[in-house]
């Protein structure tokens, strides 16, 4: 009957693939956390920018966002965290990107007569706040005295809850996961 036989608790065909992928991500993140420094900054930046790209892709299916302005600002925010810049640097980047997006929408309105300035700015800034800032703060957190311990606790708790939710939903969920 395909990959899933429809019974509760039935094995999932992609579970081995999920396990391998999850193990690789686990090793990369744990390696970054344990070694810290530039390695952790590189891991967090890569994951943060990849997540931001995906967020903008999901949002772009509903509304237009300034993906490249957002990605540039995300890279700057993550770089500021790597260099341990003051909080004013983060605020400056966010305000500047809001200005750039609004300015580009004003130009677009003048040229095409069509614009969704507030939706575009809101979506672009949402990606920075919801996706990029947490990764920037994790870069900063790792540089603190007990940062390694805090990050380990955050990731291990998140992963164990995620795995438990997956198997609970698989076994008892109303809509079976395939």
Report residues per predicted region.
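Membrane-embedded alpha-helical bundles of polytopic integral membrane proteins
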Residues: 2-178
